[in-house]
Amino acid sequence: MRKWIAIFVFSCFVSLTLCRAESSYTPESQQGDYLNSIKLTFLSWLSGSTKISYERAFPLHKQSGEICTSLISAGYDKYANKPVGFTLRYGHKFFMFDNNDISLKGFYLRPELIYSHYLYNSAADCTRTLANMGALLGTVGYQYVYKRFLADFWFGGGYALGNEADTGYHHGFELWHWLGAYNPNIAMSFSIRLGICF
């Protein structure tokens, strides 16, 4: 009889433990809601700069702020014009759909200010020339979060002004040069950023 009571108690204990484990398993229990992230712009080295971003979520407002800095010359010089300088940008993300579980995840709209400042060798006479441009962009994107891994995909466009480079590329945005037309006041930008949350 004691053997059967012991088996019954053991069976009850195991079944209660398994039920409790199943009921406590939710995606939220496996996915923490991190409010900060550090990101690198994927393949930015191939365009002549290294870009690092920091993002902070404001979960009560379904928003986040993101600042990005870029060291121009830390990468492959695709135009062979030896650029040296920096880019600064700030974007404020407005997440478009309810996502109460993960503050940094989802589709978003982002207005963004960009300032690009660098010297390069001019294609016309190889003299050192200053490219000093600013831009105001509107971007749309999607940010994916899995545990601590983050991937950010976005594109957008807007208005630019300043002293443009003869390549039209400003290490953060490009001036319009498609469809047989060039416009130094239309800026386009797109990117993929990969990072970690904490």
Protein language model regions, located:
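Transmembrane beta-strands of outer-membrane beta-barrel pores
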Residues: 42-46, 56, 69-75, 94, ...
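Outer-membrane beta-barrel "beta-signal"
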Residues: 89, 184-198
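Outer-membrane beta-barrel translocator domains and adjoining extracellular loop/strand segments
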Residues: 52, 78-82, 119-127, 164-172
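Membrane-embedded beta-strand positions of outer-membrane beta-barrel proteins
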Residues: 38-40, 54, 65-69, 90, ...
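Short loop/turn motifs that connect adjacent beta-strands in outer-membrane beta-barrel proteins
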Residues: 24-34, 59-62, 97-106, 145-151
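Bacterial N-terminal signal peptides
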Residues: 7-15
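Short glycine/proline- and aromatic-enriched beta-strand/turn motifs that initiate or cap beta-hairpins
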Residues: 20-74, 79-83, 193-197
